[in-house]
């Protein structure tokens, strides 16, 4: 497989950041107001992107896919658990993204949500068929169009003389808002090494990927929050129609959905290869897209906050164990069947995260949970040092 340039990796993660799911999640921050909402978005993204960076660096240094790096901490069979959970979350994301895209486009051209689900699903399959290293000029044109259209969206929301409107709806605490901001980069954490491992300069590509994604993701959250605060409107498609964007709105909604969801489906295929050597990554990615399209047609997926918190509870303690092993303890358990100690520590971290959800902390739940998990790893190593293999 030919190597990807740092610029190509930046484009890939720009596409991941320009996402309807991120804009829609941003609308949830409106009750906090612009200042507190922006602070929560920034704090959450700094925390989440730091973890994403470390995960990408592990993959870049070792040349292994995301789920193969997990086996370095949890062993061959232990790593299969997380590969399976990752495939599940990616099938979920594929369905959610197709659902959101079809719902938004349906607000502009009302010909039935299921039709748009099929159109978006078909385009994702085309993206998969072309492949991540051969997208080249297609990605460049798409990203340029998305960039221009998001600037137009910013102008409509922030520079049209709109006054702030009263926000109704459920109250969101600052800590819960931080956690919603952490959740997006955290959801990409089990994927980033699938791309940095194929980079010409893995370390440079990882830094660029995370910085680009972090900046664009914050931007999308702010667009969503601003839309709710300044226009009182939570439906981005409606805002675009009111602004007279029409076909331009259709383009940005469809292609932002395709470029983001492609990454979910593609990485689901790569993770599936970790489950069984018999599985072909590209074919599995296409199968995931078909399943996601069917789910988007059949099931409502309007509120994804519970899904985001579930992702956090699974993958925050997982990456905490990896960080402790790779960067502090320098343990490599890739050759063992399963590392029972790390699996128990992960389970404690998972339970701790779920319990922390009942406590309102100013830094959310992920950071305290990760600190606890890393400390447990260090204590366990001190009590019973790992035998060199």
Whereabouts are the PLM-identified features?
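Membrane-interface "cap" regions at the ends of multi-pass membrane proteins
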Residues: 1-36, 48, 134, 173-178, ...
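C-terminal membrane-solvent junction of multi-pass transporters and transport-like membrane proteins
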Residues: 3, 169, 320-389
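Transmembrane alpha-helical segments of multi-pass small-molecule transport proteins
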Residues: 12-17, 82-87, 108-131, 144-154, ...
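Extracellular loop-to-transmembrane helix junctions
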Residues: 27-57, 78, 213-215, 368, ...
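Membrane-water interface regions at transmembrane-helix termini and the short interhelical loops
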Residues: 27-31, 57, 96, 100-108, ...
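Juxtamembrane transmembrane-helix boundary signature
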Residues: 42-74, 81-87, 381-386
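Hydrophobic transmembrane alpha-helices that form the core helical bundles
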Residues: 78-113, 258-274
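Membrane-interface loop-to-helix entry segments
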Residues: 115-157, 168-169, 206-213, 308-320, ...
